[in-house]
Every structure is written in structure tokens, then in C-alpha cells.
Design a protein with these regions (language model features):
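Conserved acidic catalytic loop of the alpha/beta-hydrolase fold
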Residues: 52-69
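Short beta-strand/loop motif that positions the catalytic acidic residue
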Residues: 180, 186-188, 192
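Short, surface-exposed "cap/lid" segments of acyl-processing enzymes
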Residues: 1-36
């Protein structure tokens, strides 16, 4: 959420240099320039966007590929990975700082504060969220130097649908943990405010009886922006090594 495929620019280059073909498809209404998306706020069309529509767009894309892909996603994209993998639409999945599936919630203050733009019961569900810099600092970029926070905010952040944010509470985000599926790696940052590592670990534990490979890895001191913050190569490298051993 709040991002476009541009946030994967370094990861795409990293994996391509190592022989992989990459795709970073935009969510519906997230494919235009950052400035254009900001200028359109508040967009009624964006306000109506749902998690179900995002999943449908990926199902359609995957159906047209010559082979099933490796799936990698961050935050709400991590939940998308879990849901698509449960449908057998990938050969392996990596869910980084993943939003929780239906039935899982955190009551940690950092989770509530970071997600308040979505959780606020008085907010109009049809009005997109335009995350402020201070909200981004707390929820995504805690621990980073302010110039780096400002640069990330300016380059990557876009308005987002509240309805997408509420998606994990709906049946669209329901997972059958008794069904076999391809291998899944869940990654968490110990300093993540918006998706605390305890929430990611609880997510991992839900798969305890799933007849499939499920692994969990925490990165010490990493925040929610671990896919692009300095040192992102450590996370990408671990992901690559895991995939080489799991996506056969």
C-alpha cells in the first residue's frame, strides 16, 4: 500500500543481474507517474478499489504467463502473495512484512497508530488516504536519517484506497491452512512499526499444520522499509538463496 512498482527497482536489477526475468506489475490505478497519482487525490475511482480487484488483476496476469512465477510481495503485497500461492498460482512465494490474513490482528500500539488511517471508524471508506510525511516516518521509515526518509517519501509515496487497507478483515483474505501449496517464506523486520514482527510470526504459526514448506526469518533492526532502506541487499540476498533452495 501507498507505493507503486517503482519501489522494486533495486530488487528487479538485483535479480536480473543474477539471471532472473522480473515483472513488477502495478496494482489497478497505480500505473501512472507518482506526481499524476498525487494530483488526482482524492480520486473516487481509487477510493473504490478493493483487495479483491487487485487479486483479480494478478490472476489475469499470471494466467497469460508461459510458466508459473516466483511471487514476492511487501506489506499488503505480502498478503497478496500468500493468497495467490494458496491458489497454486506460483512456484514459491516470499511475503515481506506481510499484512495479516483474515482472522489475525495486532493490538500493539505501534500497529494501531500506524494503521489508524485505515482503522479510524469515522473516516470515509470511499476517500483515499494521503499519508503524511510524519506518518510515513513513524510507520515505514523509523530509525532512518531524516534526509533518507524525505527522499523515500518524495520518490515513492502515493495516495491509497482505504478499502484495500480493510481487505485483510474480509473473506477475500481468508486462507485454508489445511491445503497443500508451494513453499512460502515470511520475512519480518524487528523494528517494523506498522506490521510488528510478532504479527508476522503469528501469521507463520497459522501454517503449522499446512502440508507445505513454510519458513520464517527476522532481520534485526529493520523497519518496514527494509526492501529499499540501506542494507536492502542483505534481505534480497537471503531471499535469493532461499528461492534457489526451495523453488525447484
Amino acid at each position: 500500500m501507498y507505493l507503486t512498482p517503482l519501489c522494486w527497482e533495486a530488487w528487479e536489477a538485483y535479480f536480473r543481474e543474477r539471471g532472473y526475468k522480473t515483472l513488477a506489475p502495478a496494482w489497478p490505478l497505480h500505473g501512472t507517474a507518482i506526481a499524476a497519482q498525487r494530483q488526482e487525490h482524492p480520486s473516487a475511482r481509487l477510493g473504490a478499489l478493493t483487495l479483491g480487484e487487485i487479486l483479480a488483476s494478478y490472476r489475469a496476469l499470471i494466467s497469460g504467463l508461459p510458466e508459473k512465477p516466483i511471487l514476492i510481495g511487501h506489506s499488503m503485497g505480502g498478503l497478496v502473495v500468500q493468497l495467490l500461492l494458496a491458489e497454486g498460482l506460483g512456484v514459491a512465494g516470499v511475503a515481506i512484512d506481510s499484512a495479516p490474513p483474515q482472522g489475525l490482528l495486532s493490538f500493539k500500539w505501534s500497529f494501531v497508530r500506524s494503521n489508524w488511517p485505515v482503522l479510524n471508524p469515522s473516516a470515509d471508506s470511499g476517500t483515499p488516504i494521503d499519508l503524511s510525511f510524519s506518518q510515513f516516518q513513524y510507520a515505514f521509515a523509523n530509525g532512518m536519517a531524516e534526509p533518507a526518509q524525505r527522499a523515500a517519501f518524495t520518490r515513492y509515496l502515493v495516495p491509497e484506497s482505504r478499502r484495500v487497507g480493510k481487505g485483510p478483515t474480509t473473506d477475500v483474505a481468508k486462507i485454508d491452512y489445511t491445503r497443500p501449496r508451494p513453499p512460502l517464506l515470511l520475512i519480518a523486520g524487528t523494528a517494523d512499526q506498522i506490521i510488528p514482527p510478532s504479527l508476522n510470526y503469528s501469521n507463520f504459526r497459522l501454517y503449522a499444520d499446512t502440508p507445505a514448506v513454510t519458513e520464517y526469518r527476522e532481520f534485526s533492526g529493520r523497519n518496514h522499509w527494509l526492501i529499499a532502506d540501506s542494507g536492502w541487499q542483505e534481505v534480497a540476498g537471503y531471499t535469493l538463496d532461499w528461492l534457489r533452495g526451495s523453488a525447484q
